[in-house]
UniProtKB/Swiss-Prot annotation:
Zinc in keyword set: no
Record family assignment: Belongs to the bacterial ribosomal protein bL20 family.
Organism of derivation: Desulfatibacillum aliphaticivorans
GO molecular function: rRNA binding; structural constituent of ribosome
The protein, known as: Large ribosomal subunit protein bL20
InterPro entries, sorted: Ribosomal_bL20 (IPR005813), RIBOSOMAL_L20_CS (IPR049946), Ribosomal_protein_bL20_C (IPR035566)
Keyword set includes Membrane: no
GO process terms (BP): ribosomal large subunit assembly; translation
Length: 116
């Protein structure tokens, strides 16, 4: 007896077109172009989930560097001083402090300057 695939192909195509929802033109309507676009979108999503971590770390470092230099210290000396003083604040928190609470950040900078 011949085996037919039945609903499987339709289910696969429907899944791809569901993922392609919101794309413009044929990229959300035509299966072949939608499949290519979805593949590319998933590749970019995978890559950029990792890239996002690098981008945010670079942003935090730039903000900390700006805050440290306003208080007369370079970024590397600031981080070295914090390590020596056993201050366990990560770069995300330090960057937030540099923006939202400059007075507190200045105190931390003076603590790091004593150790550096």
């Amino acid at each position: 007896m011949r085996v037919k695939r039945g609903f499987k192909a339709r289910r696969r195509r429907k899944k791809v077109l569901k993922l392609a929802k919101g794309f413009r033109g044929g990229h959300s309507k035509l299966y072949r172009t939608a499949a290519d676009t979805v593949d590319r979108a998933l590749m970019y999503a995978y890559r950029d989930r990792r890239q996002k971590k690098r981008d945010f770390r670079a942003l935090w470092i730039a903000r900390i560097n700006a805050g440290a230099r306003m208080n007369g210290l370079s970024y590397s000396k600031f981080i070295y001083g914090l390590k020596q003083a056993d201050v366990a604040l990560d770069r995300k928190v330090l960057a937030e402090l540099a923006i939202s609470d400059p007075a507190c950040f200045a105190e931390i900078t003076s603590l790091a300057a004593k150790q550096a």
